[in-house]
């Protein structure tokens, strides 16, 4: 059995990760750690775990003393809060999957620019592998530190990479318009996330400044083998979970829609969690799953190709992709513990 611990277990991504690992046939959950709910029972915070998990959450400060008891540590903390514990875990040969942003960007300078935090573990930036499972599987297999991708970058990168790998688009023309459920903003109390503030309304946020922008650009630059700068505009919509990413770009040459579909189906032919569909993606059809649904349209009037993708931001955009990466790291069947049919309604 894989002995696992989670720090940041009482956030939304941490809660979903706890649910997945608690049901994983190859995992024993050794501890759950929480800064805000230390020494409280996990099921007092999340009543869905009543009679399921009786553990008390340990405090974040106790995690270091428990590293000897685990093989892998999942960190689901705010930006800038992982440096000390991840450094210690790596030193003690504990594998780490970080669900936050601290190891996604390879440049400490870019991290400072977008997060306004001085990176304290620059060496680990070089060692960390970006955990976009379908794209970087071989590197993930041998890594001890995985930077789990963000939710918007997961949906957008999976949508766009086949176009880049096949040199189909003008890379200077990429625009990403994305919508997210409110859980993407996290569990911390915020006026903007109160029911009356976000219900019955939709709003853009982080326009021209969202922190996921350089992460998406870094991934697409790596895959295109050329520098990519793009426009990314996220929106908050009044639903609990889900992301719909709509990606626009100009075609380099005329191509038929069925040809593009063939390219996508070939690119993702061995990927059980990528569904190339004819109908337009909807977040309700991926809810509670590790699936990413992708559809394509071409607007011949404007020479634009539009790729749409839908994921569950707490699953493929966070917790279930982290479990997928753990499965890869340990040589398990990739679908183990996350082979879940989307829930509806």
UniProtKB/Swiss-Prot annotation:
Its EC number is 1.2.1.38. Disulfide bonds: none annotated. Signal peptide: none annotated. SMART domains: Semialdhyde_dh (SM00859). Its main location: cytoplasm. One of its GO terms (biological process) is L-arginine biosynthetic process. It is an enzyme of class 1 (oxidoreductase). Catalyzes the NADPH-dependent reduction of N-acetyl-5-glutamyl phosphate to yield N-acetyl-L-glutamate 5-semialdehyde. This is N-acetyl-gamma-glutamyl-phosphate reductase. It comes from Clostridium acetobutylicum (strain ATCC 824 / DSM 792 / JCM 1419 / IAM 19013 / LMG 5710 / NBRC 13948 / NRRL B-527 / VKM B-1787 / 2291 / W). The gene is argC.
């Amino acid at each position: 059995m894989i002995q696992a611990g989670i720090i940041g277990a009482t956030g939304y991504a941490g809660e979903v990760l706890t649910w997945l690992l608690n049901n994983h046939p190859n995992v024993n959950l050794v501890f759950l750690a929480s800064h805000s709910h230390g020494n409280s029972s996990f099921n007092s915070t999340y009543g869905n775990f009543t009679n399921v998990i009786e553990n008390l959450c340990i405090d974040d400060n106790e995690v270091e003393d428990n590293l000897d008891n685990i093989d892998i540590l999942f960190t689901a903390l705010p930006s800038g809060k992982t440096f000390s514990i991840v450094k210690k875990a790596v030193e003690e040969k504990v594998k780490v999957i970080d669900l936050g942003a601290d190891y996604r960007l390879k440049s400490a300078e870019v991290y400072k620019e977008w997060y306004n935090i001085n990176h304290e573990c620059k060496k680990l930036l070089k060692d960390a592998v970006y955990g976009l499972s379908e794209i970087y599987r071989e590197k993930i297999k041998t890594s001890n530190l995985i930077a789990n991708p963000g939710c918007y970058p997961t949906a957008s990168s999976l949508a766009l990479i086949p176009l880049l790998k096949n040199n189909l688009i003008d890379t200077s023309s990429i625009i990403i318009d994305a919508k997210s459920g409110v859980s993407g903003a996290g569990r911390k109390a915020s006026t903007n996330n109160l029911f009356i503030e976000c219900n019955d309304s939709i709003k853009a946020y982080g326009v021209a400044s969202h922190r996921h922008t350089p992460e998406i650009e870094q991934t697409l630059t790596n895959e295109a083998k050329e520098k990519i700068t793009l426009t990314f505009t996220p929106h908050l919509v009044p639903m609990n979970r889900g992301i719909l990413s709509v990606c626009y770009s100009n075609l380099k040459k005329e191509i038929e829609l069925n040809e593009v579909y063939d390219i996508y189906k070939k690119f993702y032919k061995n990927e059980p969690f990528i569904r190339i569909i004819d109908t337009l993606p909807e977040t309700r059809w991926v809810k509670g799953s590790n699936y990413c649904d992708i559809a394509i349209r071409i607007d011949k009037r404007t020479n634009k190709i539009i790729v749409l993708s839908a994921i569950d931001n707490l699953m493929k955009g966070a917790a279930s992709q982290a479990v997928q990466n753990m499965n890869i790291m340990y040589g398990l069947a990739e679908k183990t513990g996350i082979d879940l049919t989307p829930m509806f309604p």
